């Protein structure tokens, strides 16, 4: 198996010294650099760069700068996704994001883990676990999502949370480690919106 194949199979792989992966990361970093230095008002150029980065035709995806990702092609974005400023997608493992997702500033989605033994860690070994984000979710600022986590549809993750385990659908979850506080009633029609129902 190539190191890339090992990475995608969630096996230990050489993340630091494999030239093919180094080249793929360099490609993504160059596109991120260009995106981060493109005027926010130049929406056509930004759309072109975003599609080039993720190697797909995105549908109403908005990314505020600065933004960073390792590969880009291993992020699968739904429709109507908003990524606020200074977010990082560590996408050695696949990051799947559903439709209508709001991501606050300074959020990180980290699929990589390293050996605890420093001899192996210093040899460049790494393993990547996928992250799955359901549709209609919202992340407050400074949220960290760790490898292997699934966050269910319609959930809200409070600011500053560190998500180490799966979050069920329609949950309000906060903290370090992130824990469910209560369920969210996502069946309320929009006309009932007021100071009580907006909580």
UniProtKB/Swiss-Prot annotation:
Note whether Repeat occurs among the keywords: yes
- Report whether Repeat shows up as a keyword of the record: yes
The cross-references to Gene3D superfamilies, in alphabetical order and at most eight, read: Hexapeptide repeat proteins
Q: Which domain of life is it from?
A: Bacteria
List S-S links within the chain: none
Instruction: State a single Gene Ontology molecular function.
Output: galactoside O-acetyltransferase activity
Task: List UniProt keywords, sorted A-Z.
Answer: Acyltransferase, Repeat, Transferase
The record, for CDD domains, names: LbH_MAT_GAT (cd03357)
Q: What is its EC number?
A: 2.3.1.-
* PANTHER family in UniProt: ACETYLTRANSFERASE YJL218W-RELATED, GALACTOSIDE O-ACETYLTRANSFERASE
Stated family:
Belongs to the transferase hexapeptide repeat family.
What name appears for this protein in its UniProt entry?
Answer: Putative acetyltransferase SAV2555
Protein's organism: Staphylococcus aureus (strain Mu50 / ATCC 700699)
Organismal lineage: Bacteria, Bacillati, Bacillota, Bacilli, Bacillales
């Amino acid at each position: 198996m190539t190191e890339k194949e090992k990475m995608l199979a969630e096996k230990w792989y050489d993340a630091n010294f494999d030239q093919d992966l180094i080249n793929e990361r360099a490609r993504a970093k160059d596109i991120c650099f260009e995106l981060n230095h493109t005027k926010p008002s130049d929406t056509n150029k930004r759309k072109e760069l975003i599609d080039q980065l993720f190697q797909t035709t995105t549908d109403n995806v908005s990314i505020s700068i600065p933004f960073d990702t390792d590969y880009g092609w291993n992020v699968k974005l739904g429709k109507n996704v908003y990524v606020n400023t200074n977010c990082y997608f560590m996408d050695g493992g696949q990051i799947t994001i559903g439709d209508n997702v709001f991501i606050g500033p300074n959020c990180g989605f980290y699929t990589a883990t390293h050996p605890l033994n420093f001899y192996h860690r210093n040899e460049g070994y790494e393993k990547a676990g996928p992250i799955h984000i359901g549709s209609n979710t919202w992340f407050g600022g400074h949220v960290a999502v760790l490898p292997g986590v699934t966050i269910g549809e319609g959930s809200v993750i409070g600011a500053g949370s560190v998500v180490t385990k799966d979050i069920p659908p329609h949950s309000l979850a906060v903290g370090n480690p992130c824990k469910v506080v209560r369920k969210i009633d996502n069946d309320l029609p929009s006309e009932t919106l007021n100071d009580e129902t907006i909580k």
